[in-house]
Amino acid sequence: CTLMNMNYQATLKSKAQHIRDCITRIGGADDVLRAMHGMEKPYAYRNRVQFPVGGKAGAPKVGFYKGNTHDVIDLPDGCMLLKPELNHARAIFAAWLRDSNLAPYDERTHRGIVRHAVFRVSRTGALMAIIVVNGSKLPGYEGLFRALERVGCVSLVLNELTDAPGSRRNTEIFGKKFVTLCGKERYMDEILGCQFELSAPSFF
């Protein structure tokens, strides 16, 4: 997003120069980077997103952090880089969270429930939703799953990430415990004819 004010070819040159500088500075190698090839349509391609949750009960913000802060900027119109299913999932989740009146987690007071929503979508349109909470429960999750099924959700997973009272700000996205609330424990994706079964914590 920080490069969206530049045209696409300029962003490719900027990224290539950054990589070239790192290879030279860290690896001590010069002239090893080949030409960078861009996409025909550099939008709506990202298949995974994590949305921090802010605001208050009844008026949540579901979006991204403002630069160099943990202040959540709401994203009602979605993100141009995300696949459409992810923007639809964000809107459904935000509406459900507002209507459920659940409190977003507050890093300063260590109170509230919902911390993050992470969505992943496969090339076939199968969606996995991972809701990160403070504690071990997500009241009303059945209604959320039914709503997300309209955009292809096949799995709703709860992740527990709880801070100890008096602890410093936790910058992690996931805790260690994942619990499948509805649907499948894994979903399928495919690359170059190879199929993969993916669980919530997998890196793909």
Locate each region found by the language model.
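Accessory RNA-recognition modules of RNA-modification enzymes
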Residues: T2-F204
